[in-house]
Amino acid sequence: MGARCRSFSALLLLLQVSSWLCQQPESESDSCRPGFSSEVYTFLVPERHLERGHILGRVKFEGCTGRPRTAFFSEDSRFKVSTDGVITVKRHLKLHKLETSFLVHAWDSSYRKLSTKVTLKSLGHHHHRHHHRDPVSESNPELLTFPSFHQGLRRQKRDWVIPPINCPENQKGEFPQRLVQIKSNRDKETTVFYSITGPGADKPPVGVFIIERETGWLKVTQPLDREAIDKYLLYSHAVSSNGEAVEDPMEIVVTVTDQNDNRPEFIQEVFEGSVAEGALPGTSVMQVSATDADDDINTYNAAIAYTILSQDPELPHKNMFTVNRDTGVISVVTSGLDRESYPTYTLVVQAADLQGEGLSTTAKAVITVKDINDNAPIFNPSTYQGQVLENEVGARIATLKVTDDDAPNTPAWNAVYTVVNDPDHQFTVITDPKTNEGILKTAKGLDFEAKQQYILHVTVENEEPFEGSLVPSTATVTVDVVDVNEAPIFVPAEKRVEVPEDFGVGLEIASYTAREPDTFMEQKITYRIWRDTANWLEINPETGVISTRAEMDREDSEHVKNSTYTALIIATDDGSPIATGTGTLLLVLSDVNDNAPIPEPRNMQFCQRNPKPHVITILDPDLPPNTSPFTAELTHGASVNWTIEYNDAEQESLILQPRKDLEIGEYKINLKLSDNQNKDQVTTLEVHVCDCEGTVNNCMKAISLEAGLQVPAILGILGGILALLILILLLLLFLRRRTVVKEPLLPPDDDTRDNVYYYDEEGGGEEDQDFDLSQLHRGLDARPEVIRNDVAPTLMSMPQYRPRPANPDEIGNFIDENLKAADSDPTAPPYDSLLVFDYEGSGSEAASLSSLNSSESDQDQDYDYLNEWGNRFKKLADMYGGGEED
């Protein structure tokens, strides 16, 4: 272990620094002065070619920061300065001069930049490399001593930095193994005990390094792993037997040197790249990359070299690609890449450390050959024919088919069609994104009367320009135009006519006609108005002459916009099918002074006390000069209580206010307004004077209705209506409570008649010679009034009954006429009501009551003649004509 862990050059450097410190006066050691130990450092290099990681030497800097490490900066980016001052080569380089100089910077505790110059001197090629002894990394010193001072035991003002101790990782053998012995110069004066502190000693990982207490031998207790910890910073201590420090702590840096124990690892298992077909040799395709956990600065253990092991397919050449040994960039080395033949290549790439001589690993690189436009699309077939109806836009004419050997759905495959001989851009070709076919359509309507057939030449290319000298393919398309009945066309499509608004009724405004585009057809055109919202116009269907049918009004805001009235006229031909064209008639109505000015508002409220004036705006729908300036005047005595004055110089508004305090109530103000052309009008303003002061907020005016009636009049009207309703209710109540006195149909048994006698015995003749004809009226005139209360009464005329005649001979006619009146009487009692007749009349066929049963034949018992008297006597006939008794 001792031979591999020694560094004679480091020991020499330590002794030189120690000697220099011993020669310094005491005054300089008392204060810390920041700066480099030398203004110029000169390092000898064996040859001009320097490999990466080569150690040149070390610079020393005191920053007075109390920290053992310092950040350095090299102005030459080819060199790296670590925090311990060691200068190494960052990458392979060649020194073109015998001397190369650069500056190294560092900063002190006050952030002041300090610099030193580093010079490299080349010894030339005759000095072989193994004759050069590296001052830092060759071996470790066998003995390290604490610095000594002239004046006894004192704590030094600056840290004591020694060269690092190198120890290889993964050491085999028995442990612990000695690294270096630490010795104090005062071990002859007193017994000295040694100890170490820091990570790896008394801090995690604890126990990696130990020191023999009496001898000062620093030992390592286990194999080291540089990939885990590449450097240990320890502090050695020397104390006397009584525990007093005899030396200041000394920094010990143990650097773990690398062994090639890690193989390279690709950052990806499969790398993907692409290159255009036909790429020239030297074209970069992609880059593969691998990493190695070993030391890539001081050793070649992580120096990776790349090679291609295999290529699949090995066509058209075995080695189509090459890889840069150092960078891993894969490039084309042979021409002949053709996507249509070999679209992909798979390479097996190896990465090996020790510049290709050490551990290795492999990965795949998949290279896709990108398509270029080296194949032109070809029409198949190259001639087409189609037809289209005239005036149709976007009509499909033909489908153009092409073939292209390039990769589908790429710019080199996507077809772009162009109609060569189409100067008016009447046609267009749209590419179907799925099939790559070209759809030929009309971009504008075609006119059969202008041209009946088109012969088009269509070329096809790709979105991506052609590679090389490819020629676009051309197809010929014959298009036949089919004639259709076209609608008449108004000339112009929008006709503007200016007329005064008082143009009159029945007068001709203009002639608006359309032309027939179908010149090969003889068709008749008729006209009619399609839209005339105000019904002002009429048109001659044969000639297209438009006339007025009603008075026009420019101020009609519903139908007139910006003094323009719009009407739509249609023209219809008699073709098959019928076609209709539309034209627009714009009537610009010039203004006439047909409107007098009016005030706004017309209803106002004033306070009775200290009233605020009101502003009245004058409105006139006419146009200048038939409007302002306006003239205003109070008429019909309104100026007695009110005053007006103009509110502006244009006289377009007025100020109205009362002349004096007025009573609360309503006032009518007649205001005459005239425009600039003396068109005037008198308008009545309604003004309410309220019980308030100043500005009207809540108008307290006399209680009145808007109709103008006073309260007493309203109360009188309501009282009359109420009295009439009460009278009607009383009348109805009286009618319902009226009592009807009915006379009995038959007289009581004890009723004594003067001329009627009763006979209780048979035989003899009738003695009643005297009779009273007034009794015949009991069934008609003296009948009780019958009123139905189950239905609403109907209004109808009462039947007229004939009065009793004075002549007894007319009694028959009297009965017949009154019988008919009774039959038509709706208020008559039911048919089965009992009627009493006290007088039988003269000439009775019955000589006596005793002879009723003495009839000798059925003729005598026939009562059918009673049916001739009406329904009322039918019951009587049924009662007495039922047949003979048993």
UniProtKB/Swiss-Prot annotation:
Ca(2+) 1 binds at D261. Residues 815-886 are annotated as: Required for binding alpha, beta and. The modification Phosphotyrosine is found at Y757, Y758, Y759. The modification Phosphoserine is found at S774, S797, S842, S844, S850. One of its GO terms (biological process) is pituitary gland development. Residues 762-773 are annotated as: Required for binding CTNND1 and PSEN1. The chain crosses the membrane at residues 714-734. Residues 759-771 have a biased composition (Acidic residues). Ca(2+) 2 binds at D261. PROSITE patterns: CADHERIN_1, CADHERIN_2. During apoptosis or with calcium influx, cleaved by a membrane-bound metalloproteinase (ADAM10), PS1/gamma-secretase and caspase-3. Processing by the metalloproteinase, induced by calcium influx, causes disruption of cell-cell adhesion and the subsequent release of beta-catenin into the cytoplasm. The residual membrane-tethered cleavage product is rapidly degraded via an intracellular proteolytic pathway. Cleavage by caspase-3 releases the cytoplasmic tail resulting in disintegration of the actin microfilament system. N-glycosylation at Asn-641 is essential for expression, folding and trafficking. Addition of bisecting N-acetylglucosamine by MGAT3 modulates its cell membrane location. This is Cadherin-1. It comes from Rattus norvegicus. The lineage of its organism: Eukaryota, Metazoa, Chordata, Craniata, Vertebrata.
